[in-house]
Structures are given as structure tokens and as C-alpha cells.
């Protein structure tokens, strides 16, 4: 009624307005609207959107048509909108402003938005069909509310009896609301409908209510009643049509609005599928529902699996006037022969594998059969039988019938309640299915019975078999106080505490009792422990007896094993500690570094042996064989303590300022703390300068002379000697350097030691000097001379001297060119006339210490031909001819 009023008002207003020319065409898409006019035609300038018949929309963004573009005698008016098209909406009362070619004045009252062509809905999509009980549908598209609503949609403008309003949700005045994406609620109804997006009936979408569905089909044959459950059935019986196999059904009632239909007086005799179609007000089910009327089985006969034969099935609905059934027993087809409503016959071919409790299906047109009782009716072929079972040489042989094949047969052994399965790849069955053989697995108990199954059909007999005792030795005993652990299989179960096994080794006349067998390894077998007499060697025969059964086997003693080594006082003898060496020197062979040293053995027992240490021995592996039994583990690597040959310095009995002492020997760098090499000087530790396996160079920290030098290997004394230091000698007196920051001088000599005092006497004063002693051959030696003829890992220490580096303790100014140098080394005093040379600052640091300088004269004599510096050549002292030259080659590895 409301929509008819809208239409009437528009018609009334149109009588009082001027009708302008219509556009030639309207083009619209997601981003634009274009009106095309003839060049002499009036045209639109903008939209004027209304909320209702009297109220303008004040919230709409500005819009206008740009009509400046003219192409081929046509005017193109392009719509411009300051907002998104999602906000372009208005009532059917909205107008457009127009302008004539001859008059620039806009006319905004004369033309309704729907008078001429206008942008109709575009790209309309919907989320689905509403249920007959009503529901929501989401609509999307463009220009959906340009001339209608906005909060209602109409479904008809011509049939008042079928007209209803569809509610549109959303606040169209909300600037964030998208008027092209909204939800509409449909009232309960059915069939096909039209949905109009404008209030003039120009723009519509063909829609319908959802198709009926079927969720269940319930047949009550006793009442001849069918109940169909589902959805979208609406509420009026007159609108419902139900078809079974295309035949329309009468006596239809909607028993639950929208969701349940009942069909009365339904009768069907034949089994098979039935097609169900439901139509509600011309809207049909999307896909026909299929209901199966099954054949019902109450019993089935059996046939031989070898011969096959006719199988008889009894029940109801076993015959159809239009469908020949397919019958399946297990995974085999049974060929249809004939049937009545209550009985069916089919031919089953031979099946060598047979089967028990096989499923049976009589299928009519895809409809599986059911059973009349609560338990399914199944089919069983002939059952296998076993007549006997024997054991010989570990192989079990079964005799019977219908034993099948390894693929469908299964053998299970039950031994005192423990179950063992024989895998099908571990047994064989004869082609005539009368014999089965398999290797007997290890069982803890002697007696067991056999359960033979074929396709889940157990044989009617379970033969029992007893196996002889079987033993396995699982360890090696030690030479003395040893024992062996024996695994026991096929023993009498249960175990009797009063019955214990015994063992007899070799030709012994007496037996040794073993422990009572106990279960081991998750109860898979029994185990006993037996003591073994003292002995050595391999493959020792023994006899094991338990109850009335005996079993022969053998064992080997554990091989010799080395755990450690030790040395006697003085390191003259070596003792090897371990196990299983025996006590007979005639049965033991010892190899050190591949050489047989058995003859050097001085004492032997099961846990150790001692042999003499020879100087020729070097570190290496030691291997032992006792009575033919070798230690197969990785060989024990024997490391020997150090050997000190001599103290090299003792030939000349002298050492210099550096206190260098050289020790020769072998294995000097042992890592064993018990045999660490130490060198003492006057009972004080020395500092290692050059470490090597064969040579140690150490420095004495004690400067007293004479110097008693002793060596120790661990706590054992080695060679010793007494050394004396060289007498101090001054060999080089260079020119005193007078620098801006003070004066300095470097004095060279031999064996410079003791308390050192120094000063420089000049005419005006006596300047105290502070001196540092730098001994040659120190750990941080700076006086090594490179010798190109040596290898890259060697150094040559040649013609070295000690050095005093003296300098004034304060910055002073000295204007003189000569003076007297006073030196006191311990109790000995020296004084020398020296020259003083002023040293200017230089940009080249190396220029101050390069080249040769003339030496100063010594008091009481002169030194000639000596190069100035702490590394010098030979010097001659006046008054006593003295030549000092120390040449030492030291091999030193560089990292």
C-alpha cells in the first residue's frame, strides 16, 4: 500500500512539472556515471537527494555533472561526487537539476530522478536464499538505494495480496554506513519472488526462497507411514508436492512447520533404491534424495572352499521385478541364480583361502542388505584341521587338512601362558594344504601347544609338543674366581626350587652346582650362573645338566686386560697391572713395540707381571696373549719415564750472567706428574727456557757462585754437578748520549751480576745513574742473531754478551763533552774515561742507533776493534789476554 502511495504521489507531481528531454544513454560502472545528450537537448547539472517526500538530505556531499565535453554532436555529462558511491542514496522523491541550452538557469524542481534513465543497480550479488521460515540475506552492488527506501525493499507492485515489505538493516544517515552493502530480513514465505531496489518498480532482482532439503527418511512399515525430516517445507499443505520414483504422493501433511512432512498409506514390496523429490511452491529439492529398501537376510548355508557350490539365502525382500541383485560373500562374488521374496540362490566359486564369519551382502541397485536379528548373518567356509605335530632338529611339522597358504594362515605357540607368533615368512605349507613346517623359535618352557588359524578360523585340534633343553653361554669368565651366565630355553616349567642345574668342565670328575634358574629380559628366558675353575684359554668344553636332561657346550676365558703400569724405585723395573694374565710364564707372550719381551718377565700372577726396563725401550703399545687368548681391545700404550744423560755445562764448570744450564736425555717432557723432570740450582727451582724431549735449557735464578746443580725425575735423583759463574768483565764502553730528557749509556760485558752502582762524574757534579741488567740467553732474549744457513725452526746465539743499560734518574743539562764513568759490580769497582755526545732530535728514529761508534778508553788499558752495543764481537783486555765467545745452537719450535 505504501508503495502504491509513492507511485500515486509521483504521478500527481508530474502533472505540474516540466518534462525535459531524456538523455540518449546512461553509462555507469564502479567509479563513474556518464549521461550522454544530443547537443541541442537540455541536460542534468546535479542530483538533489531527498530523505522522504518533503525532506532534503543535508548530509550528502556536493555533486555535479561536468558537461563541457562534446564529441560528435553529443554532450557528455560526467558525474562528480565528493564522497564514495557507497554514500549515494536517496528516496524516490529525489530530483535532478537541469539546464536548457538557451537558458543557463538551473531548474531543480521539475524533474524526478526516476523520470528518465537513471543509474540502475549494478553488479548485484546476494549471500544466499532465505529459509521458508524467514532469514537474512546480504546484498552487495552499486546504486542499490538511489531511488528507494532506504530501510525497506518491495517484492511486488502489481499483486497486493502477495506484497510484503523486506526490512533493510542499517543507519543510512551514518556517514560510515555503506548503502551498497546491507542485510535484508525476509519474512516467512516460499516460492519465487522479485526484489525491487527502487520504489517505482523499474529495478528488480529475481529471487526465491531456499530449496527443500531432506535430512532423514523414516519408514514405519507397520503403520504404512513415511516421515521426512528436513527444512524449507513452509506451512501450507497445498504448496507441497512429494514424488516417490516420480510418482506423486497423496495424503501429505506438514506435521512440523518448515521441517517435517508425513506421507500416509505408503506400501512398497520390492527392495532397492527409491528417488524422493519434494517441491514447495514450485521450488524443488536441489538433488533428489535416495532411500534404500534393503533385502533382509535371516540365514545362509555353507559350501566347501575347495569345491564351491550353491549358497541359499533366506529372509524377506529377496526378489525384485526390475533389478537383478549382486551378491557378495567376503570379497567374492556369488552369481545370482534365482529368487523369491523369501529365498535366493547363488553360485559361489571355489576359494582356496576359505574364511570364517565373512560378511554377506545382497545388493539391489546399490542398496545393501541387512540382517533380521541384532547380530549380522555371516558366512564360513570349511574349517581347517590338525591331526599331529612333531619336532625334529629344531623343525616343527604339522599334519592336517585345509591348511591354506602362508598368506592366509597364522601359527601361534602357547608355552605355559606365554604367546609366540610365527611370522608367515617363517613357515611353509605344502601345495595340497596338508603339511606345514617351521623353525621352532626360542621358548622358555619345554612344552607348548600349537594354535593354527586360517583366515580367523581356528583348527579343531591343538597338538602339544616338547622340545629338548637348549643353552647359550652369554659371557666369558675371568681366569680366577670366574663364572659364566647361561641362557636356558625349553626347560621344565614351572621351576622347582629344589632342582638346581650343574656343570662339569672338561674331563673333570666332579660337577659344580649352579644357581636356581630365574627369569630374565622381560621374562623371555631363564638364566643360571655357574662357577668356573681357574684356567686360561679358549673353547673349553663343558657338560650342563638340569633335571634329567644334559646339554654340551663350550666357553672361553676372558682375554688379558691391561689397566695401568708402575715403576720400581729407581725406575729399573716396569710392572703391568690388569687381569687374566694367568700364572704360567710358559703360557704368556708379551710384545712391546712389536718385539717379544716375554723373556724379560721377572714375576707373574693373574693381576700383574714385572719385567726389566732397558734403556733401548721407547714409548709404544704393549700386546699380551695368554694361552692363545689375545686381548682384542685397543692395545695399551706404555709411556716410559724420562732418562737424563748428563748436565752439559759440567765440562767447563762455568755459566754466565744468564745462568743457562743444559740437560740432555730423552722423554724429558713427560706429562706424568710422577716423573716430571726438575732442575735445581742451590736447591732452588730453575726456569725452563727451551723445552724439548731430548734437551732442556733452563736458567738459574740464583746468582751465587759456586752453584750446585741437581736433577730429579719425580722424587728420584739424577745427575748433579757444581758450576761457577764467569768473573765479571767489562768489554764495551761506548760514548755517553746526552739527550734532551737526560743522559744514557749502554755498557757491554760478560757475567755482569751482583749489586750494581753507577754514576757519571763531570766537573760540576757527580750524576747518579740507574742501571738495568740484561743478561744474554734470557727467556725474552733480544740478542738472537738470525743465521740464514739454519732451518726455519732454529736460532743461532753467537758472541753474546751481557748488557748494562744506564740512564740518569732526572732530566739534567750537561754542557761538557767528557767525564768519568764509575761502576761497582758487587765488590769490584771500575772507572772509565768516557766521551759525552749531545744527541739532537731526529725525524728518523733509526739514525740514533745505527752505524759504528768509537769506544772510550778503559782505565789502565784499551779495548780495540769492538763494535758498540750489547751484542758485540771479541774483545781484548790489556793486562790479560781474554777471549770470550759463546756459540750455542738452540732448536726452538715457533707457534
UniProtKB/Swiss-Prot annotation:
Disulfide bonds: none annotated. Its main location: membrane. It is found in: Cell membrane. Residues 295-381, 560-638, 642-725 form the IPT/TIG domain. Residues 22-861 are extracellular. The chain crosses the membrane at residues 862-882. GO terms for cellular component: external side of plasma membrane; plasma membrane. It comes from the Eukaryota. May be involved in the regulation of aggregation. Activates tgrC1. This is Tiger protein D1. It comes from Dictyostelium discoideum.
